[in-house]
Amino acid sequence: MARGKPGKAQLDMVSDMLSILTDPKDCVSDGTDVRNYGELSGLSAAKRLFADILGCKPEECFIGGNASITLMYDTVSKAYTHGMIHSEKPWCKLDGVKWLCPSPGYDRHFKITESFGFDMVIVPVTKNGPDMDVVEELVKDPEVKGVWRVLTVPFLTYFASLVWA
């Protein structure tokens, strides 16, 4: 995997999906023609699928396009200009914002935090992922607003879990 792009073997695993849909009726889900714009929070069928996989409610899922980095950027941008649901003010009005960056990590994640001027706090990565003892200590700082996290599990290539302080 380079720069978040799946390798040939990963792409080959889903090649058969390109020929599954053979009739326009196959493109309708819950009355929505999926060849066109769907619901803002994502297709209901996709939300049900991922809710089952993630063990949550469909209404707790947001299904976006295939570029998760865009969703990440949009979320950070909104927090920067407007704050989050429990924020007292937009992050741009705070004295400082810190973001936990497991290293090695994904350069495009780092570019987002860098472009907003966040202090990037390096978190070492063990064979099991970020050193969670370090993360648990660092999130005690109220200036820490998030952590980049790259997961590799079935159906989820990239996911940024944002830890809101």
Which residue stretches match the model-derived regions?
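Conserved N-terminal helix/loop that builds the PLP phosphate-binding region
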Residues: 2-30, 140
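Conserved core of the PLP fold type I
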Residues: 26-27, 31-165
